[in-house]
């Protein structure tokens, strides 16, 4: 089909417009052969009937794309494609009187903001626009085109439908991909985009389109950076996310030179994702036609890894009907001199045909719209409407009209580098038909498993493939079983908790059977009093813990398990049972254990459900430990007890420690006052009544309204908020502590110096100004204590110190010492006794420590067996060892290094190096014999024999040392390498202790001389091994690797065959590379270029004319 036939309405006349009948091409294109004859068809007469002004009209088509910023898009040669289309169109227009078409190549920036600007600029210059390519600019371009009356063909928009002035070239990419995914039932997909704006926007537009069709797009991620590392990171995000069947690659195809897709596929092969568990679908191939055929793809032929990874790729691309291809059409156009003869067709992207088709499709819509409008100028909307009905000759086949273009699914066979057609998409039904070749998945597998078909059914809500009614019933069953299980667990838990609370060692519910009262025959008021400890001031008790002592005459004291207890009654007298919330709250409070916090023992319940009926109704009380000295208020009121500052500070420090412990456990006392602080028989103060408000709230008992006298310790912010007063705050406890400190320091009631009634004091504290606070003179306490009190009285809660800060400040007053009157004398005696015991223990420990140091030092100088013999005073006889392995090493160029270094630097060098060696030999069965200068000597097989293992131990140690030396650097000359040479030899020797002063364990024999000779004839970074050692290593068969060095002249031995030890199988540590010795160079020194300039001057002064030497 040719342009002339579709301009008149789409009738086909192959004899009229053949490929040889085009008009001369525009400048830049080769000349076109002249048309020999003209034959008019009746539909063409429509153009001839148009007014002459219309026939001579010029229609400018803009081709917008990232031609300048994207080299792969530029390979589509949009200039040649658009000019070829215009040339053919103008040839038809010249023959049949149609309008003339001109094309303008417009660059589109690769960045999204620039793309929008390019669209806006292009719409003012053209009558029709092919583009944009960036999906982010598609919707704005359509709106601007409607306003400007310009027709659009946005072939790069993945989800665009024909609407307004927009007419797509092909079926939207989302529809084609959806059809493919539905055919294979792959619902869960992920999108990986290139980092450029164009592809990122395309990925988001495609994901939106797929989600609109009901598919669960699991992930949309970008490759950043756009290399192999970015590809690995993107694929790891795919692995870590929800299950995925297919990965859509929104980027240039690797078949066109896309490096991002190459990296992604190679990374997938490395990570094992190209094994058939995932399928990879390229996105950009939906916009052009890749043709199957026998031609090899060079990009696959040149890389076996990519060819293997590409086996997991299914390529969906436009289908050229009748077996044609873009490459064949390019070849025919070049043969007819419509394209330059020197154009390399292999370098032209198949996108050439898409650009050509877009221009032709737009021209067809213009022609049909003008005919329908009687020859007048038409709007973009009219052109778009007629494009849908136009049928034009595409570059490789018919295009447009009622028939949608089709797609073909291409695949490789994993071994070759060719593409085969497997399925063809039916454009009308949306189904694939087999093209004869089955899809080949990696490793011959079946590919990713299918998802439930409900994902592709618009009338079904998909829940993992299960029917909604079944899901709903299952959900109800699970919820019902969960509720039943929760109820059963709750019931069992509370039942078990109740059993534990009423019986056993941890019970907390106490009855009349558990507590013995002082006057069991009295009335109810004699059983449990109101719980105020104020009345204790009238008592005189010498020892309430003794049954034979004088007992107080009050019924709020009882005997529980042999100890006296105190009962604090709950308000009211109608408590039938203890609520579960009360039990839980009390269990948490009872867990508070501290020396300065009174211990709660249980909840007493008389009458009701608590046990045998008591006179009256049920009585509920908190049972706590009883303190013999009563409350702090009682103690302060007893004037016969003298309280000096030592005594007062001891009490206050106990109080601070107790409140601090409660605050650390998140407990605000809320009712802190001097009568809630009790003192035991040892004058240790303890905080009690804590958590009482929480227990009342759990038991749903309203507290009794506090009197003004009880509110003297309450912070001002709590006085203003009754609800907050019942609960208490941490800052409120600090304020109450400050009032108690005033009581203790002044030994008077709160605010006693103000001569005001409690009601007046509470009113002034609640409603300042002025501030109402106690007054303490500086002669009653240290100034630091008074300042701390004033900080605790601060009006603003946030200005008061925390209990940790209060504790630190108060400790600093007495320098951290705790004083107690009664314990003072006992403490002195105990301290003297304990000091004496500690002194003896310390001296004994020091003696033992020094002995261990001496033994450790001796064993470092001599073998343990020899050291023990010397300590016992027994003589150490020389011992003959049949077979040992010796190690010798020294530093190459040590004399040169010494000449370039200060003496202290030489010492530091040897100390650092030998410390490194000593750390290594600790991991091997070897014995360090000695070090002389830069020489290091180690032996294995003595003084403890180890069979033939000595050779392997020395060899392993030598490899470890050589590896460590490769990274060792001198502190004063880090740029100068430290090279060592190592010699190993196995054989017999004699070992013994020589001398009485500074005895040394020495080795004697020919083996020692030979090992030393092996070292001296070695090379830097080499392990020189004698034949005897190699034979033992071979017999051990532990994988040691040796190389033959050749015959070496050994001092006193003559020429012998020697070897290099180069490694061991499984030894993965790096070994430094031995330096290459130039002919005539010494193997014992340092090269001139390795010596720093500043050190070289010093060396010249020390050794003129010589720069290396041993």
Swiss-Prot record:
Pfam families: ANF_receptor, Guanylate_cyc, HNOBA, PK_Tyr_Ser-Thr
Gene3D superfamilies: 3.40.50.2300, Nucleotide cyclase, Transferase(Phosphotransferase) domain 1
Enzyme class at the top of the EC tree: lyase
Residue ranges occupied by any Guanylate cyclase domain in the UniProt entry: 885-1015
Top-level taxonomic group: Eukaryota
Residues covered by the Protein kinase domain: 493-813
Membrane-spanning intervals of the chain: 468-492
A single GO BP: visual perception
Keywords (A to Z) from UniProt: Cell projection, cGMP biosynthesis, Disulfide bond, Endoplasmic reticulum, Glycoprotein, GTP-binding, Lyase, Membrane, Nucleotide-binding, Sensory transduction, Signal, Transmembrane, Transmembrane helix, Vision
A molecular-function term among this protein's GO annotations: guanylate cyclase activity
Regulation: Activated by GUCA1A when free calcium ions concentration is low, and inhibited by GUCA1A when free calcium ions concentration is high. Negatively regulated by RD3; inhibits the basal and GUCA1A-stimulated guanylate cyclase activity.
Major localisation: membrane
Topological domain ranges for the Cytoplasmic compartment: 493-1110
Positions of the UniProt region annotated as Disordered: 1070-1110
InterPro entries: A/G_cyclase, A/G_cyclase_CS, ANF_lig-bd_rcpt, Cyclic_nucleotide_synthase, HNOB_dom_associated, Kinase-like_dom_sf, Nucleotide_cyclase, Peripla_BP_I
Glycosylation (residues): 302
Tissue specificity: Expressed in the retina in rod outer segment.
Keyword Membrane: yes
Reactions this protein catalyses: GTP = 3',5'-cyclic GMP + diphosphate
UniProt subunit comment: Homodimer; requires homodimerization for guanylyl cyclase activity. Interacts (via C-terminus) with RD3 (via C-terminus); promotes the exit of GUCY2D from the endoplasmic reticulum and its trafficking to the photoreceptor outer segments. Interaction with RD3 negatively regulates GUCY2D guanylate cyclase activity.
Function (record text): Catalyzes the synthesis of cyclic GMP (cGMP) in rods and cones of photoreceptors. Plays an essential role in phototransduction, by mediating cGMP replenishment. May also participate in the trafficking of membrane-asociated proteins to the photoreceptor outer segment membrane.
Family: Belongs to the adenylyl cyclase class-4/guanylyl cyclase family.
Name of this chain's protein: Retinal guanylyl cyclase 1
Organism from which the protein derives: Bos taurus (Bovine)
Lineage, opening ranks: Eukaryota, Metazoa, Chordata, Craniata, Vertebrata
Gene behind this protein: GUCY2D
């Amino acid at each position: 089909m040719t342009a002339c036939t579709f301009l008149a309405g789409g009738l086909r006349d192959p004899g009229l417009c053949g490929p040889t009948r085009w008009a001369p091409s525009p400048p830049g294109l080769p000349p076109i052969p002249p048309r020999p004859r003209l034959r008019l068809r009746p539909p063409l007469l429509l153009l001839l009937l148009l007014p002459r002004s219309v026939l001579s009209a010029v229609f400018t088509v803009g081709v917008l794309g990232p031609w300048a910023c994207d080299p792969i898009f530029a390979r589509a040669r949009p200039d040649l494609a658009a000019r070829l289309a215009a040339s053919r169109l103008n040839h038809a227009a010249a023959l049949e009187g149609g309008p003339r078409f001109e094309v303008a190549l417009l660059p589109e920036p690769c960045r999204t903001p620039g793309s929008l600007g390019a669209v806006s600029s292009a719409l003012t210059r053209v009558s029709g626009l092919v583009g944009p390519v960036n999906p982010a600019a598609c919707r704005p371009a359509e709106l601007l085109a409607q306003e400007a009356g310009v027709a659009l063909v946005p072939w790069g928009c993945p989800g665009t439908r024909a609407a307004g002035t927009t007419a797509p070239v092909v079926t939207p990419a989302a529809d084609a991909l959806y059809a493919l995914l539905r055919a294979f039932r792959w619902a869960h997909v992920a999108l990986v985009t290139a980092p450029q704006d164009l592809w990122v926007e395309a990925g988001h537009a495609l994901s939106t389109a797929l989600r609109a069709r009901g598919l669960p797009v699991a992930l949309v991620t970008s490759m950043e950076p756009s290399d192999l590392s970015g590809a690995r990171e993107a694929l790891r995000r795919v692995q870590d996310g929800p299950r995925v069947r297919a990965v859509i690659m929104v980027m240039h195809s690797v078949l066109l030179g896309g490096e991002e897709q190459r990296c992604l596929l190679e990374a997938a092969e490395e990570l094992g994702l190209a094994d058939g568990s995932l399928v990879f679908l390229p996105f950009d191939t939906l916009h052009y036609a890749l043709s199957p055929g026998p031609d090899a793809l060079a990009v696959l032929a040149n890389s076996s890894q990519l060819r293997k990874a590409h086996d997991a790729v299914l390529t969906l691309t436009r289908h050229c009907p009748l077996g044609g291809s873009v490459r064949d059409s390019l070849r025919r156009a070049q043969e007819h001199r419509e394209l330059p003869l020197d154009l390399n067709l292999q370098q032209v992207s198949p996108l050439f045909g898409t650009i050509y088709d877009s221009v032709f499709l737009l021209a067809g819509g213009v022609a049909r719209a003008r005919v329908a409008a009687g020859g007048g100028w038409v709007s973009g909307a009219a052109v778009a409407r007629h494009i849908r009905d136009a049928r034009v000759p595409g570059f490789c086949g018919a295009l447009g009209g009622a028939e949608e273009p089709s797609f073909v699914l291409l695949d490789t066979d994993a071994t070759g580098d060719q593409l085969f057609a497997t399925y063809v998409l039916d454009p009308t039904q949306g189904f694939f038909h087999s093209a004869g070749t089955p899809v080949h998945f990696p490793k011959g597998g079946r590919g990713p498993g299918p998802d439930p078909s409900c994902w592709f059914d618009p009338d079904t809500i998909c829940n993992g493939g299960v029917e909604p009614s079944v899901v709903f019933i299952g959900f109800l069953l699970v919820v019902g079983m969960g509720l039943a299980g929760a109820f059963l667990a709750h019931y069992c838990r509370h039942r078990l908790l109740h059993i534990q609370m009423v019986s056993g060692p941890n019970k907390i519910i106490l009855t009349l059977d558990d507590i013995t009262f002082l006057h069991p025959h009295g009335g109810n008021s004699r059983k449990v009093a109101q719980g105020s400890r104020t009345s204790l001031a009238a008592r005189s008790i010498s020892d309430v813990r003794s049954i034979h002592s004088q007992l107080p005459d009050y019924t709020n004291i009882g005997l529980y398990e042999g100890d006296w207890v105190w009962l604090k009654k709950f308000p009211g007298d109608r408590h039938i049972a203890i609520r579960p919330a009360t039990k839980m709250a009390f269990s948490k409070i009872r867990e508070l254990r501290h020396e300065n916090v009174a211990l709660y023992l249980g909840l007493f319940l008389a009458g009701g459900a608590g046990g045998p009926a008591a006179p009256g109704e049920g009585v509920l009380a908190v049972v706590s430990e009883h303190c013999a000295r009563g409350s702090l208020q009682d103690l302060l009121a007893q004037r016969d007890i003298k309280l000096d500052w030592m005594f007062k500070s001891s009490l206050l420090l106990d109080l601070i420690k107790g409140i601090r412990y409660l605050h650390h456990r998140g407990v605000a006392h809320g009712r802190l006052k001097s009568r809630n602080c009790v003192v035991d028989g040892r004058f240790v103060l303890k905080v009690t009544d804590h958590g009482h408000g929480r227990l009342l709230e759990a038991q749903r008992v309203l507290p009794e309204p506090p009197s003004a006298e009880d509110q003297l310790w309450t912070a001002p912010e709590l006085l203003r908020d009754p609800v907050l007063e019942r609960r208490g705050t941490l800052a409120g406890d600090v304020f109450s502590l400050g009032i108690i400190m005033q009581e203790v320091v002044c030994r008077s009631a709160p605010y006693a110096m103000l001569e005001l009634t409690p009601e007046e004091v509470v009113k002034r504290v609640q409603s300042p100004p002025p501030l109402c606070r106690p007054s303490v003179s500086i002669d009653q306490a240290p100034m630091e204590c008074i300042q701390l009190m004033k900080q605790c009285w601060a009006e603003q809660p946030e200005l008061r110190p925390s209990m940790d800060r209060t504790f630190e400040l108060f400790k600093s007053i007495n320098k951290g010492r705790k004083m107690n009157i009664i314990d003072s004398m006992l403490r002195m005696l105990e301290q003297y006794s304990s000091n004496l015991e500690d002194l003896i223990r310390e001296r004994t420990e020091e003696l033992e420590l020094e002995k261990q140091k001496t033994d450790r030092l001796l064993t470092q100088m001599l073998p343990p067996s020899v050291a023990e013999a010397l300590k016992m005073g027994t003589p150490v006889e020389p011992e003959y060892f049949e077979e040992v392995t010796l190690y010798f090493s020294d530093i190459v160029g040590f004399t040169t290094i010494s000449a370039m270094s200060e003496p202290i630097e030489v010492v530091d060098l040897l100390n650092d190096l030998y410390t490194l060696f000593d750390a290594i030999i600790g991991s091997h069965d070897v014995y360090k014999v000695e070090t002389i200068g830069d020489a290091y000597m180690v032996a294995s097989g003595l003084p403890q024999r180890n069979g033939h293992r000595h050779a392997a131990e020395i060899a392993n140690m030598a490899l470890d040392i050589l590896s460590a030396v490769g990274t060792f650097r001198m502190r004063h000359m880090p740029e100068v390498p430290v090279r060592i040479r190592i010699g190993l030899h196995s054989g017999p020797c004699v070992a013994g202790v020589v001398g009485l002063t500074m005895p040394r364990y020495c080795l004697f024999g020919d083996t020692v001389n030979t090992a030393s000779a092996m070292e001296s004839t070695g090379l830097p970074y080499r392990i020189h091994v004698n034949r005897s050692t190699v034979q033992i290593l071979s017999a051990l068969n532990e994988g040691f690797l040796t190389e033959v060095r050749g015959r070496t002249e050994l001092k006193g031995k003559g020429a012998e065959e020697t070897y290099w030890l180069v490694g061991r199988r499984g030894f993965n540590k790096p070994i430094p590379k031995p330096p290459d010795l130039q002919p005539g160079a010494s193997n014992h020194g340092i090269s001139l270029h390795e010596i720093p300039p500043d050190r070289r001057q010093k060396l010249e002064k020390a050794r003129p004319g010589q720069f290396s030497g041993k």
